[in-house]
Design a protein with these regions (language model features):
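Short, well-ordered beta-strand segments in beta-rich or mixed alpha/beta enzyme
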Residues: 4-11, 49-86
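Intrinsically disordered, low-complexity regions enriched in small/polar residues
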Residues: 5, 9, 21, 40, ...
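Generic detector of contiguous secondary-structure segments
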Residues: 18-31, 66-71
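Glycine-rich beta-strand-turn "strand-cap" elements at beta-sheet edges
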Residues: 31, 35-62, 88-117
Length: 117
């Protein structure tokens, strides 16, 4: 059964091009590791909520944009084995590949697919 990793982050709006380049590089790395599908999206209509929302969850500042991303793996087992190797990959070191956003405010998680049509 497919497995999905999902991410939400706040990226400085001025860093859109840098974020796209960064994401394209990571998409290639994840594809090497076995990801079936890698998607990065740039927030266009992401309203602030009263109780909770994407912007609130990542403490989005006025000069930032929310990004929503996910990748699909063949299975959780493939994903777990790949992440073990990816965490040792020097390309994941922020000193080697600096993040164009504040990674401390990124939220992420792994999900089993319930419906896929």
């Amino acid at each position: 059964m497919h497995y999905v990793d999902g991410f939400v982050a706040a990226v400085p709006t001025a860093n859109r091009d840098a974020y796209k380049k960064y994401s394209e590089g990571f998409a290639a790395i994840f594809k090497e590791a076995g990801v079936l599908h890698y998607v990065e999206t740039w927030g266009v209509d992401v309203p602030e909520g009263k109780l909770t929302s994407f912007p609130m969850a990542v403490q989005c500042k006025p000069d930032e944009t929310v990004v929503f991303s996910w990748m699909t793996w063949p299975s959780k087992e493939v994903r777990d084995a790949a992440w073990d190797q990816l965490m040792k990959d020097p390309r994941f070191d922020p000193a080697v590949t600096p993040m164009p956003f504040d990674g401390k405010r990124m939220i992420f998680g792994g999900f089993e697919v319930l419906v896929n049509r």
